[in-house]
Amino acid sequence: ILDLSGEIALNNFRKIRDLTLKGDFSPVTKADEDIEQFIRDKIFEKYPNHKIIGEELDDFEGSENITWYIDPIDGTRSFVAGKHDFGTLIALVINDELIGGVIDCPALGERWTSFSSNATKVNQKITKCKAVDDLKDAVMATTSSHEFGMKKWRAYQSLEQSVKVTTTGSDCYNYGLLASGY
């Protein structure tokens, strides 16, 4: 599924001319919708009763306690701006327990997978977070600090001053890098 959804993303990458702003002013493209629909269709082929919650399309309630979460293009702003650090996120939850998830960054050729019974992998190689005992040695990654209200902004600034490095943007790619120990 991810190889093919990645092809949809790459076939649209740096070709986006139109986008729509959602109610929260975040952008969505036809590629977002096409990728999510493709992933949903593939899930429905095998699991027609599973619940699906997606970023762009209406939720499907399903009749089982199995839920798929889909963000077809995490980092749509990066995608629209021609930056390579966007990706597709998929998570599987059964009976309110996270079973696993995937971060797929097709333009970078990197895919992180993590399932409860296995180690986290990037491109099929085992990886792990860096152990940090002191906050001053930590790396902090966030989507954007501009989305915080004043109270959260103050907390963010305090935390930012307490860590070794802060990086913003890059959405899911940052989280993959953290999972790889960077």
Predicted regions and their residues:
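An extended, acidic
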Residues: T127-Y182
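A structural micro-motif at secondary-structure boundaries
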Residues: V122-I126
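Residue-level signal for inorganic ion chemistry
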Residues: S5, A9, D32, I43, ...
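DPxDG-like acidic metal-binding loop motif
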Residues: S63-K121
